[in-house]
Design a protein with these regions (language model features):
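Surface segments flanking catalytic/ligand-binding clefts of nucleic-acid enzymes
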Residues: 168-303
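Short gly/ser-rich loop at a beta-strand->alpha-helix junction or flexible surface loop bordering the NTP-binding
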Residues: 1-187
Length: 303
């Protein structure tokens, strides 16, 4: 559900094992795994789904390695799952045994090994040691930047933006690191990644918020600040009141409310208090559960 509010002018003023912790430190230097993994931004069921997918892929890779059938470097959806980041493609490919398909990348076609069920090999001639993260268990995973790039063949530009912002939200990479990678590497879909990077912004709290911003942009509505802090009001604990998206010049604020805003009692109460504070400020508030869908029906997209 989305909330659209126009404000009056303002003054200008689970895995918990040591292996998982070591893996996350190796991947992106996160020391406080439990406090910095980005899962606090998702509703419980979504966070649980991400963690389960991560655990599943890890278990499959361990089993393949024990049978000496794991080779190359984890890439694409497998690398996304291992990093604990939401996968915008919602890939659910599984083997006949019901386990996730594992994607690996090798440098040349000669490095492919045939006849291993459940393993899909891709070739990237530019693969080098600097692109690989080594885990304590000996499972090699593409670093976040080439992982993002590897999805260019299957994701749309908007989905690449969602993936990049999710990686940034989880502390896996930065926009600057993605730009450096694009500048120094060649791969299929590079142009698509360059277009996506132009749209990437930091501060998004969820993939749905990214989707909302991109939806507005597709109608020519640009210039929205992400995570805008509303001046003059704050929560009882002193925390700032923010809006998912805002245009400070036009005094327009927009928020995306996921289902947990309805089902989580504490979140619901915070939302009610927040809306009342905005109304006290002479704000005008309207709510619609299908706001994006309605825009798609009644407003032509900009070319």
């Amino acid at each position: 559900m989305c909330i659209f509010c126009v404000l009056r002018p303002q003054p200008r003023c689970s895995w918990t094992s040591n292996r998982r912790k070591q893996y996350l430190r190796t991947m992106n230097g996160i020391n406080d795994v439990n406090g910095s993994n980005g899962q606090q931004h998702y509703k419980p069921l979504e966070a649980q789904s991400i963690a389960q997918r991560q655990q599943e892929v890890w278990n499959v890779c361990r089993a393949l390695k024990d049978r000496n059938e794991l080779y190359g470097v984890l890439t694409r959806n497998s690398a996304i799952a291992m990093s604990g980041v939401p996968d915008p493609s919602m890939d659910s490919a599984r083997t006949a045994d019901g386990v996730p398909v594992v994607h690996v990348v090798v440098q040349t076609a000669r490095n492919r090994r045939k006849g291993i069920p459940g393993v899909v090999a891709h070739v990237w001639k530019g693969l080098s040691e600097e692109h690989i993260c080594h885990t304590q268990d000996g499972i090699d995973v593409l670093a976040p930047e080439p992982t993002w790039a590897s999805m260019a063949e299957t994701l749309s530009v908007d989905m690449l933006v969602e993936l990049a912002e999710s990686q940034m939200r989880h502390g896996r990479t930065t926009k600057e690191k993605l730009a450096v990678f694009l500048e120094g590497n060649s791969f299929r879909g590079r142009r698509k990644c360059q277009l996506a990077l132009l749209l990437v912004e930091s501060g998004s709290d969820s993939p749905k918020e990214t989707e909302l911003r991109l939806c507005l942009l597709s109608y020519g509505l640009s210039g929205f600040a992400v995570g805008y802090v509303v001046s003059g009001i704050s929560f009882e604990n002193g925390a700032a009141v923010t809006l998912d998206l805002a245009d400070p010049e036009l005094k327009i604020g927009i928020e995306y409310d996921g289902d947990h805003h309805r089902t989580d009692k504490m979140q619901w109460r915070r939302d009610v208090w927040k809306r009342r504070q905005l109304e006290v400020w002479d704000g005008r508030l309207s709510r619609s559960p299908n706001w994006i869908c309605r825009m798609n029906r009644i407003v032509p997209r900009s070319p």
